Amino acid sequence: DETVNALERKAAEMCGREAAVFVPSGTMANQMGIGIWAGRGDEVYAHVDSHILIDEAGGTAALWGAHPRGLHSAGHDLDVEELLEAVPMDASDVHRPLARLLCIENSNTASGGRVWSAASLARVTGRAHELGLRVHMDGARLPNAAVARGCTLAEASAGADSVSFCFSKGLGAPVGSILVSSAEAISHARRLRKRLGGSMRQAGIIAAAGLYALEHNLARLADDHARARRLATALAGSGRVSVDLPSVETNIVLARLRRDEPAQGLVDELAAAGVLCGAYDRRTLRFVTHLGVDDEAVRAAGEIAARVLT
C-alpha cells in the first residue's frame, strides 16, 4: 500500500534508521523487536516493571522461547554494574543462557513517564554493545520523550538497534505502531509479522492517520506535558495522595496513596465525581493527559480530584 510505504519511510527517516515496518499494536512491535535478536534459550534483560516483562502476556518466553530476566535499575536509567552482574562472565559456560538482548523503555512508564538523558542512553547502550548485547527500545511514548528533551526521535533513541513507537498514544491516531531498525532486521521482522498475523491489507486508511499524526501532532505533545504538571500540582495539595513533582517530565502523573487503602477504591470515587484515572498498582493512581484533554478539562479534574482526595 502506497500510504503504508510512505509512513514506514517517514518513521525510519525521523528515527535515523534504514527501514520500518507498520504493525497493529505496540506489543506486536516489541515482540518482533525481541524476536529478531533473541531465540530459544537466549537471555533477554529488561526492567522488572517494564511493559515487555509484565504486560505482554509472557510473549518473550511464549513466542520466542527466550528467557526474560528482570533488572531493578533499568527504568529511566540503568546501573551498568547490575547489567555486568547479570551477563555471564564466560559465554562458554554451558550452565548459563546466552546473553542476547537488553530492552529499555523511553519514556519509562514505571517511573511516571520519565525520560532517558542523552548521557545515560549513550552510557548504557554503549556498555550493552561492549557486552555483546543488542538493544531494543520500547518507545511506545518515544515522541513524548523526544519533545520533553527537545530533541529528534533519532536522538531520543540513539544507540538502540531496534525501536518501536506508537501512533495511538500521545500522537492521537486511532491505531497502529511501528518498528524501525536496519534494512536486514526489518526484512526479518516482516516475516515475524506474518507469523503473528499482523500483516494487513488495505491498511492505508489507518496508515494515513499515523502520517498525519507525525506531521501535525508531534510538537503539541508539549501541551500535554504542561497539563500533566498542572494536574500533578493540584493533586500534590491533597491529603490522601502524594506526587513527586520533579518526576512529571511527560504526560503521566503517578499519585501514591498516603493511607493503607486500595487504589481501586479511589479510582471508583473519582470516576463517580467525573474524573477518570487508573490504578497503576494497589497503592498508586495513574493519570494521563492526551489529545482529548484540554486546559479546561485539566482545571476541572484538578479541582474535583483535590476535593475527593482531601
Question: Which positions does each model-derived feature cover?
Answer:
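Conserved PLP-enzyme active-site core in the AAT-like
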Residues: D1-R258, A263-A273, G278-V293, A301-L309
